[in-house]
Design a protein with these regions (language model features):
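Expand to "…catalyze enediolate/carbanion chemistry for C-C bond making/breaking, isomerization
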Residues: 1-92
Length: 92
């Protein structure tokens, strides 16, 4: 089991920050769909996160996605990202 010393949360709606996070070498990068994203930007954030997981080199960083709460009306859409092959897991 690998030790995880750093966990970097990044708003999923900000491509520039996602790109930067991919290059920093954190043990885990958590792409946030919950508090870090305005309600009006949730759909765009899902698209950016999917693009980032497909196109960016995160090196050895584990990739996680923090999904919205079950009662938010957003979680079902968020969970579609769970099947992405470059995603390690979800943060509930």
């Amino acid at each position: 089991m690998r030790a995880r010393r750093t966990l970097l949360y990044v708003p999923g709606s900000d491509w520039r920050k996602i790109e930067k996070a991919a290059s920093l070498g954190a043990d885990c990068v958590c792409l946030d769909l919950e508090d870090g994203v305005a309600p009006s930007s949730k759909a765009e954030a899902r698209t950016l996160i999917s693009k980032a997981l497909s196109e960016l080199d995160f090196g050895r960083s584990e990739r996680l996605v923090r999904v919205n709460a079950a009662d938010s009306g957003q979680q079902a859409e968020d969970l579609l990202l769970a099947s992405h092959p470059n995603l390690l897991g979800l943060v509930l």
